[in-house]
Amino acid sequence: MISVRTLVISEYGAYVYVKKNMLVIKKGDKKVEISPSEVDEILITVSCSISTSALSLALTHGISVMFLNSRETPWGILLPSIVTETVKTKKAQYEAIVVRKDNRYGEEIISSKIYNQSVHLKYWARVTGTKNDYKELLDKDEPAAARVYWQNISQLLPKDIGFDGRDVDGTDQFNMALNYSYAILYNTIFKYLVIAGLDPYLGFIHKDRPGNESLVYDFSEMFKPYIDFLLVRALRSGFRLKVKGGLIEENSRGDLAKLIRKGMEENVKEESDHNPKTLIQAIRAHAVKLASSIREGKEYRGFKLVM
């Protein structure tokens, strides 16, 4: 139920409420009490419930609350009111994207994404002792790099997974796990972009449509290869999802959410930054860096993995 600073509520019938300023998770006759000071984020999946007093206590303590449904998409996210330099940052963001049509930030994000995909493949080439095409990615544009990347990923996965390429509508375990895991990543990124004062709906790469979190999708591209790594590592180690009717079963969704959140709380190494940090801390730091770069009209250096 608990993954370090993330509280995952996924068991059918679980209920979260407040007692004496403590978060209480009840499931049948079992109860667990947790101090809000020990939690940064609550993930709650379908078939669970949470009281308004628990939501109030969470937000008062700066805890975000993320809701995920059964179809690998988020219902929504509740954020505490902690936002920095909003007006100045959003104005600069609008001017950069709409007025000047500044492509520097989007280009750096895509460059970092391809670099991280290459680093991910290189890691597995080293660990498995087999050759792959990690060098080829660096000379290709995004669509071509993606084709090479996913083709190589398919060779790394156990045959019973049945993955033969990235497809958001795919019904194999890996594609479904990617959808669900990316949804968790999107909500985490949404949170930190908003806190940094950026407009999550105004992006550099993805098209702006009503309700489309364009900047969230843009920004996530740099971090997706690490999410891919977490899933490949888990599936190669025997982790499996239970799927029924084209959906991940409830208990498996909870297991997957815990796996991803735990992985995001592992330390990652970043090029040109020797300070150890978790992936979540890296996301938060880069949201602040991007906001600062946009406000000041300066270059932004994207997130680049070392593995």
Swiss-Prot record:
One of its GO terms (biological process) is maintenance of CRISPR repeat elements. The keyword Nuclease applies. GO terms for molecular function: DNA binding; endonuclease activity; metal ion binding; RNA binding. Its EC number is 3.1.-.-. Its cofactor is Mg(2+); Mn(2+). Keywords: Antiviral defense, DNA-binding, Endonuclease, Hydrolase, Magnesium, Manganese, Metal-binding, Nuclease, RNA-binding. It is an enzyme of class 3 (hydrolase). Mn(2+) binds at E142, H206, E221. The keyword DNA-binding applies. Pfam families: Cas_Cas1 (PF01867). Signal peptide: none annotated. NCBIfam families: cas1 (TIGR00287). CRISPR (clustered regularly interspaced short palindromic repeat), is an adaptive immune system that provides protection against mobile genetic elements (viruses, transposable elements and conjugative plasmids). CRISPR clusters contain spacers, sequences complementary to antecedent mobile elements, and target invading nucleic acids. CRISPR clusters are transcribed and processed into CRISPR RNA (crRNA). Acts as a dsDNA endonuclease. Involved in the integration of spacer DNA into the CRISPR cassette. In vitro catalyzes a concerted transesterification reaction on branched DNA, as would be expected during integration of protospacers into the CRISPR leader sequence; Cas2 is not required in vitro. This reaction requires a 3'-OH group at the branch point. Binds ss- and dsDNA and ss- and dsRNA with approximately equal affinity. May be able to anneal complementary DNA strands. HAMAP family: Cas1 (MF_01470). Belongs to the CRISPR-associated endonuclease Cas1 family. Homodimer, forms a heterotetramer with a Cas2 homodimer. Forms oligomers, probably binds nucleic acids as a homodimer. This is CRISPR-associated endonuclease Cas1 2. It comes from Saccharolobus solfataricus (strain ATCC 35092 / DSM 1617 / JCM 11322 / P2).
